[in-house]
Amino acid sequence: MLLSTHLLFVITTLVTSLLHPIDGHAVKRSGSLQQVTDFGDNPTNVGMYIYVPNNLASNPGIVVAIHYCTGTGPGYYGDSPYATLSEQYGFIVIYPSSPYSGGCWDVSSQATLTHNGGGNSNSIANMVTWTISKYGADSSKVFVTGSSSGAMMTNVMAATYPELFAAATVYSGVSAGCFYSNTNQVDGWNSTCAQGDVITTPEHWASIAEAMYSGYSGSRPRMQIYHGSIDTTLYPQNYYETCKQWAGVFGYDYSAPEKTEANTPQTNYETTIWGDSLQGIFATGVGHTVPIHGDKDMEWFGFA
């Protein structure tokens, strides 16, 4: 790990995340954030926090919202819009909290990159299954999202536990497996990946994701990928590599998307659509990280 680079990642992520505007809503939070410690096997001691709105829907959906480096579950509850949105749409929000001192997620070890491998991803998956059972949640309406390090983990969750999630939104992350450590370092930093120098084919990226749950042939979550053009923490090439990965997984021709829409969802954002299961949203002039578009997330998840 290059310490100076890692510190830059931590500091930049913290500052930009705190400055990001989020969607404003008239609906106010009326529930309260609660810590859960008995959700089952927790091999890496990941913290679990949950927000249950007062107007909880019958058979509610679930959104797993994963924080950035230096963050915590309670911190992401405070500066992301999902708890407020849950009051409007009646879903439950799970906020995992990193067990590591820097607040980043382990997206580098073999354990976390393997289905039921005993890593961070395993702990988060167990939070989901506990919540479905506890609250009678609709297992077909479970979604995952995250920013920066949390976006990396979102891609990992989509690859390691595709059976759990219907859709995902990824705010400024890297491809699943891009941070892989060949020395099996837990919570390791990968400068080569961060700087956009891990470049390969859609087919190769797909094979990396698919190997995380070997033999799985079921449905996979629809993916929506956001990235900024002037991101100097996780360089913009990571946007293209992530889109390649999921295009490969879904069998889309990465080089021939269905369409590209300028100034969508807002000015200077360009949306590329490969098919029903994959959209990429590239934000010109935006750094690290792209602000959360909560209303658009609700549309992608099917709540709105």
From Swiss-Prot:
Species of the source: Aspergillus awamori
Record's catalysed reaction(s): Deacetylation of xylans and xylo-oligosaccharides
Any one GO MF annotation of this record: acetylxylan esterase activity
Annotated active site: S148 (charge relay system)
Residues of the signal peptide: 1-24
Pfam families: Esterase_PHB
Family stated for the protein in its record: Belongs to the carbohydrate esterase 1 (CE1) family. AxeA subfamily.
Pathway where it operates: Glycan degradation; xylan degradation
Glycosylation sites: N190
Regulation (activators, inhibitors): Inactivated by di-isopropylfluorophosphate and phenylmethylsulfonylfluorid (PMSF), a specific inhibitor of serine esterases.
Function according to Swiss-Prot or TrEMBL: Acetylxylan esterase involved in the hydrolysis of xylan, a major structural heterogeneous polysaccharide found in plant biomass representing the second most abundant polysaccharide in the biosphere, after cellulose. Degrades acetylated xylans by cleaving acetyl side groups from the hetero-xylan backbone.
Quaternary structure and partners: Monomer.
InterPro entries: AB_hydrolase_fold, Esterase_phb, Plant_Biomass_Hydrol_Est
This protein's name: Acetylxylan esterase A
Gene Ontology CC terms: extracellular region
